[in-house]
Every structure is written in C-alpha cells, then in structure tokens.
C-alpha cells in the first residue's frame, strides 16, 4: 500500500496529474500554501474523483466471476483456480481514492467559504470514501480503516491492523448520512455525473441490503442483520415516497443507449459520464470499447437464460408454456419474459456483421443489451455513459429488504417494485402473494429472480451469490452455453460443436448436467470448484501483509 503514496502529492491534491507511474514521485507545480483557499479549489480537488475512476466507477466491464457470463477463457475466480496474489489493484486502487478523500476532508477546513459550501464538498469526499470502503469490505471483509491523510510513506497508519467490518460499514453509513444531508438534489447538480443526495441514499440502500443479507446467511457473530436491512428500507422509502426524484425509463432496450443518457432519464441515479454522444474517438474524448468487447468476448450462459420466466409468470420447471423440445435456436424466446429478447440476440437479428448466426462468435448466448451497432461499425468505440446506479436497483432492493426484514411483503409493495419492472417491459404476469401460493412458488426466490434477470451484465450477480451464500452451490456447477441445432449452424462447424453438447436427456461425460439434449457445455463441473471455507472472501495481497509489518493478517484458508 505504501507505493500508493508515490502517486499522491505529499501535501497537495495533485490536480495537474492525470495519471502516474506508481514507482515515481510526480513533481508538483502547486503547493499547499497556494491552495485550499476558495470554493474553486475545493471543486478542483473533488473533480479528481471523476477524472480517475476505477473498478465499478471506471469504464464498462463484464463480470466473469459468477455463473452469469463467460469470456474467451475460464475466469479463475469463477472456476475456483485463483491463488494469493503478490499485489492487486483490488486493494490498492480503492485505498488510493480513500486517501484522496481523507486529504480533502482535512484540508477543506482551510478554505475561506461558508459552512454550507464547505459541507457540499466534504459530502462529496465522504461519498467516495464510503463507496470505496464498501468496495474493500465486500472483497476482503475486515480491512484497515485509515481515516487520516498520510503525507509520509513511514506513517504508522500504513501498518494498522484490520478493522472489524461492522465498524467500517458503520463509518460508511455515517459518511453517506452526511452526504445525503449536504449534497444537492439530483435536479440541482451543477455538473451532470457528479454525485447527488439521490446517489448517497441509493448507496445506503445498496450497503444496507448487502450487509444485512451477508450477516443473515453467513451467520456473522455480533451482527444485527435487521439493523442493516432497516437502513436499506428507510433510505429506499425516502427516495420512493418522500423525495420522489426518480422513475423508471419507459424503454428498457433504449435505456442502455444514448437515448437513456442525461437528466431527462429519471432512472439515472449516478452515472459515469464519457464523451458527447457520437463523439469522435480521439485523445480529447473519453470512450470505451463496450460493444467491441461484447462482440469479441462476452457470452451469456444458459444458466441465466433458464432463469427468465414464461409469460404466465411461471419458471421453466412449472410453466405449461415451456416447449417440450426446442427445435431451433429461437425457440428459447418463445413465450418468455420480454427482457430475454432485449438481453440476448435472436437468430437473424442485425448484429455485429449482419444477421446474427448462433455459434459464429461465441458458444453461449451473445449479449445484446447495451450493444450500439452504429458505434461498433464506425468507431469500434463509443461514448455512451455508464449507469453506476439506476433507480430500478432501489426498487428491487426495497422489495428484497422488506421481505428479508419482515418475512413477508404486501401486494402493494410488490406492485411498486417488482411489478413496476415488469410493467415497463409489458410482461403480462404480475407477482402477487396469491399467485405465489397458488403455484407453490417461493416469494424470496421470485424477488431474487427478478433482480437477476433485470440486471444481467450490470455487475450484480457475483455480489448477490456471495451475500446469499449460494456461491458454493452455483459456482461448482457446469457452465452451459446455447442449444445447438444443425439448422442454425453453418457448414463443418457442427461436427466440432457436437463434441461438447449434452445427449440422452442432458447427459455429458456420463453425468446429468441439465434436462435437455444438445446444450453446449462451456465448462464442466469437474473443471470448477468453490471452497466455502475461504472463497467467500478475497485473499489479501502478500505485499500488503509484508508492508503492514504482518499487522494485516491473511483471510482464513488462503496461504
């Protein structure tokens, strides 16, 4: 961690630095004596949060750690082959941002501004500190909670031991409560993409639900899961019933394109802003290669496709609308939740290089959600903004938190959460208590299902299976791809593909992996594992243990 300070201006904010070599101390053209005096100085200091975003706040990323997506090769976290790293940006990058926050929080007191102005920028710094502390807790559990600016690589703070996660999460709540009080409403944010009161409240929802369910299902000693769930419920209740600043965008498909950008889309809660729409790709515009990666790398697993309901509101193991046998690729879309056809490509749709042909790019289901054909065809890069938090997350998190807290949810609460998401896509069947009882469903499972299908490829699935403590069940299972039909695949590729498909009612290599023939097997269960004793937390990078003087201890089971 000490190497991070080679990237921080000792005694300054380093506003002139866009990037840095972690092994070099950058020169400074700005001293503390000349800074921290005006509102413009505070604004410039906080702008750094938006100039150098990483992790979930960075560009578009496709999370291959779970059973949701598969890339060109196996993911070491998903298949259980990961080992203890020497160093890792998963640790250092969040801490870097936390140290920037702490620097601002200490030195903003020098500025000759009103308390209201100062508190606005303190709130911004505290939002990002909470965001990154939570990012660390999700991965590592207990972490060193460093709450001061460090201007010396020998500062004792860099050797502090791990702080209990409960204490770190409480600090996140304190920071976000302050942020929610002092940040402007989203309607009055000066610069679009900067954090608002809504973003702070939504983070309270996210953290409260995560920590509450993590404590509940992992049975953490000393943790009060209901306390955290109540934090989520209360914050969501404010957003939904008091502030009322947000609503769902009417078009799910367009939500992830340029049409869904900006203030006019009230589903946007916190976005990572890139360049102007259809911006040329050059050094003056920030772009990303999301659509290009979707063509070259990303495939949605059959494991996820099977979770989509049929239009009667029933899952595939209960619905009479399920076809007895799929005869072609597009049969999987028959009578399904409309979001399925908005998430993956159907055969014949205009896609990467003309009409989409199954198995021509990947051996799973090719991701359609968020793909922008025009940018891919002309630029191989795009500038569409990334939604870090959207209002749909608040709605479904409210439903889940209510059920986990109370053990039940009312039809009215379902109607303003789960059923709002369904109405947006014109899903015929609504979720009610009577429907669940009549068909022998599990309400919690249906709420979780709704979250999963709504947020395919939005970096939710891995965190969800970790907090629900079902990773030990879903990650060691086969990863399945698309159904192979000789009518859908060109030429001689069929014989090669047939070596990896299920036969005789879902058998592969002598084991039953699903209930259908001709399903492509992306990864076998024999090639996947999950050790519940250790894999629910990341291993601490070895260098961080050494740099702390062994005060930071390794997570259980990692060596």
Model-predicted regions and their roles:
Residues 39-54, 74-140, 156-170, 174-192, ...:
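Conserved, well-structured interaction surfaces
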Residues 20-76, 143, 147, 177-178, ...:
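An aromatic- and glycine-enriched ligand-binding surface/loop that stacks and positions planar moieties
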Residues 326-391, 558:
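Flexible, polar/acidic helix-loop-strand segments at domain edges
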Residues 94-97, 171-173, 255-314, 381, ...:
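Long, intrinsically disordered, low-complexity segments
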Residues 149-150, 162, 214-233, 385, ...:
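Acidic, serine/threonine/proline-rich low-complexity intrinsically disordered regions
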Residues 1-27:
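Bacterial Sec-dependent N-terminal signal peptides
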């Amino acid at each position: 961690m000490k190497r991070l300070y080679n990237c921080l201006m000792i005694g300054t904010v380093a506003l002139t630095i866009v990037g840095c070599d972690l092994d070099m101390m950058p020169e400074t053209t700005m001293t503390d004596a000349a800074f921290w005096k005006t509102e413009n100085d505070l604004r410039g200091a906080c702008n750094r949060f938006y100039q150098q975003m990483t992790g979930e706040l960075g560009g578009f990323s496709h999370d291959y750690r779970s059973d949701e997506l598969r890339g060109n090769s196996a993911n070491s976290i998903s298949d259980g082959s990961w080992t203890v790293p020497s160093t890792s940006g998963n640790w250092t990058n969040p801490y870097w941002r936390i140290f920037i926050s702490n620097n601002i929080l200490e030195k903003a007191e020098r500025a000759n501004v009103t308390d209201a102005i100062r508190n606005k920028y303190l709130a911004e710094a505290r939002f990002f500190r909470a965001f990154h502390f939570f990012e660390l807790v999700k991965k590592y559990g207990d972490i060193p909670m460093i709450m001061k600016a460090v201007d010396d690589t020998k500062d004792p703070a860099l050797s502090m031991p791990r702080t209990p996660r409960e204490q770190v999460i409480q600090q996140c709540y304190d920071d976000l409560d302050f942020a929610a009080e002092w940040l402007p409403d989203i309607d009055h944010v000066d610069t679009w993409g900067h954090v608002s009161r809504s973003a702070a409240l939504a983070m309270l929802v996210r953290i409260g639900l995560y920590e509450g369910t993590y404590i509940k299902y992992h049975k953490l000693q000393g943790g009060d899961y209901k306390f955290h769930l109540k934090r989520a419920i209360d914050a969501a209740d404010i957003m939904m019933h008091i502030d009322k600043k947000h609503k769902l965008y009417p078009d799910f498909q367009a939500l992830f394109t340029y049409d869904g950008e900006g203030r006019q889309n009230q589903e946007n809660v916190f976005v990572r802003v890139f360049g102007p729409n259809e911006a040329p790709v050059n050094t003056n515009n920030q772009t990303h290669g999301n659509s290009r990666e979707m063509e070259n790398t990303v495939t949605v697993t059959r494991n996820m496709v099977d979770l989509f309901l049929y239009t009667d509101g029933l899952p595939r193991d209960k619905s009479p609308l399920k076809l007895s046998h799929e005869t072609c690729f597009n049969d999987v879309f028959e009578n399904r939740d409309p979001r399925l056809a908005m998430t993956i490509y159907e055969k014949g749709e205009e896609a990467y290089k003309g009409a989409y042909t199954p198995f021509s790019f990947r051996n799973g289901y090719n991701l359609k959600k968020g793909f922008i054909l025009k940018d891919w065809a002309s630029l191989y890069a795009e500038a569409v903004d990334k939604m870090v938090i959207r209002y749909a997350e608040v709605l479904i998190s409210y439903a889940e938190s209510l059920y986990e807290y109370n053990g039940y949810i009312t039809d009215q609460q379902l109607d303003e959460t789960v059923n709002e998401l369904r109405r947006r896509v014109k899903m015929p069947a609504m979720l009610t208590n009577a429907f669940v009882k009549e068909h022998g469903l599990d309400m919690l499972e249906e709420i979780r299902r709704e979250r999963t299908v709504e947020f395919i490829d939005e970096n939710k699935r891995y965190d969800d299976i970790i907090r629900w403590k079902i990773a030990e069940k879903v990650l060691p299972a086969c990863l399945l791809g698309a159904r192979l039909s000789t009518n859908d695949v060109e030429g001689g590729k069929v014989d090669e593909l047939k070596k990896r498909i299920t036969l005789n009612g879902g058998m592969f290599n002598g084991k039953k992996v699903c209930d259908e023939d001709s399903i492509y097997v992306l990864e076998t269960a024999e090639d996947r594992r999950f050790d519940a004793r250790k894999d629910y937390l990341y291993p601490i990078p070895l260098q961080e243990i050494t740099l702390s003087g062994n005060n930071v201890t390794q997570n259980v089971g990692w060596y």
